[in-house]
Amino acid sequence: MDKNHTTFENFQLLEENLVPSSSSLLFYENAFSKIKLIQEITSKQNLPILYIDLDFLFSGYVKSKLLTMSNLTLFNTLESKVNEILPKILTKISIEPHLVIFDSINGLYNTLSNDVDSGRVVNSILMLLATNVSFSNSILIISALAGKKENNWLLPNGRQILENNKMKKFIISDRSKITIEN
């Protein structure tokens, strides 16, 4: 992946906000840019990384050895169910701080698409993670392929993303520009 190196404008803005006990939403339009940004974030982290990959793109890069990280624990729903992954994540962050990357809200909705209450389940899972991250001095990044319509962040399927004042919102636009929304 290094041959197509991307420099992110305003990366320091994101880096300054990734502090212990914080949760952030990362909105993106281009999945490749999201992976490049996550690669840059993780390369600068000292914390062990827990990556929950529900859209399988990151897993593909790791399995094909296009991305290598020594302090990475990767979870995906090809190998485990969401209800098996969550207790493992919560146990790990209760023992020591981690950088937790939840990729993505879109993938979680797809995983739970047969559940009538998928919206409530998705919001409950994300709030459970955010709350536990705050207690454990971990850092949480939740990614979503989303767009803004009438001041609300919406997934491509039209579902509105639950927003929380304690979660910072970062947007990757134009493939390499990072902005923060208050």
Locations of regions flagged by a protein language model:
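Pre-Walker A adenine-sensing motif
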Residues: 2-21
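C-terminal regions of RecA-like/P-loop NTPase motor modules
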Residues: 1-7, 177-182
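Conserved P-loop
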Residues: 19-89
